[in-house]
Amino acid sequence: MKNTVIRGTAASNQIRVFVANTTEMVAKAQELQMATPVAIAALGRTLTATSMMGLMSKSEKEKITVNINGGGPLGPIVVVGNSKGIVKGYVSHPHVEGSNLYPGKLDVGSAVGTDGTITVVKDLGLKEPYIGTYPLSTGEIAEDFAAYFAFSEQQPSGIALGVLVDVDYTIKAAGGYIIQVLPNIEEETLTKLESKLSTLEPITSIIDRIQDPEEILNHILGEFEPVILETYDVDFVCDCSEERLEQVLISIGEKELTEIIEEDKQAELVCHFCNKKYHFDEEHLNKLRSEILNKNNNI
């Protein structure tokens, strides 16, 4: 139940909603990235949002890449997701220490920064992917996704994302929701929804107390008679492999690869997403260089 997203509707199909509990997923990301509280708060929020966005896809082949770069000390945050809600991601500087806005509330906005953009790339496997970019509004992630949806996709959305880090730096709760109003929404329903969302306690408090996404949905939208359409198991999964890293080395070209062989006689590559190390000895590098030369000779 700790890595679950539910998709549903409410108010007789006037509202679309996604609710996520991603506590274990964010804990896994924290362990892989060895991230500080403020770093995992920023990354965890982005992972949760991207997972829910992936589940909005109408194509099973769609891949989503979210890049948040606000010019802050954390550096760019990159998350990649698919149509099943499976994600992987990293924060460029995971060891940055942050400050609190007030006791118990991390200042994620200052760590992310606001001098930059949120960019969403949706790759459907066609010739050109869809790319949407919008200036960051607060760096707090949820508001930035809401602004992206409103202006890049013309979809008004209420979004809450959160990561609750315990005193021992473990992840106590993580998750969020995306609530979107559909074109047929009545003014009275919209006013009632806005009022409800404005009075909710922080999403991490709700998840820490309730945990089950179905119960969270009823807590948030119970008066709108929500209907659950589907439940998804989501996760942080890195699909890196030696073969993929071989392609990275091949892509640098014969000249640079030869320089590495002559100067270092080995190479070590580290996956950004899971920090797994791949070691290539001189024999392996020479084999890759031969592949490049053979390919060039056949052109």
Curated annotation (Swiss-Prot):
It is found in: Cytoplasm. GO terms for molecular function: protein folding chaperone; unfolded protein binding. Under oxidizing conditions two disulfide bonds are formed involving the reactive cysteines. Under reducing conditions zinc is bound to the reactive cysteines and the protein is inactive. Keywords: Chaperone, Cytoplasm, Disulfide bond, Redox-active center, Zinc. Pfam families: HSP33. One of its GO terms (biological process) is protein refolding. Its main location: cytoplasm. Disulfide bonds join 238-240, 271-274. The keyword Repeat does not apply. One of its GO terms (cellular component) is cytoplasm. Belongs to the HSP33 family. Redox regulated molecular chaperone. Protects both thermally unfolding and oxidatively damaged proteins from irreversible aggregation. Plays an important role in the bacterial defense system toward oxidative stress. PANTHER family: 33 KDA CHAPERONIN. This is 33 kDa chaperonin. It comes from Alkaliphilus oremlandii (strain OhILAs) (Clostridium oremlandii (strain OhILAs)). The lineage of its organism: Bacteria, Bacillati, Bacillota, Clostridia, Peptostreptococcales.
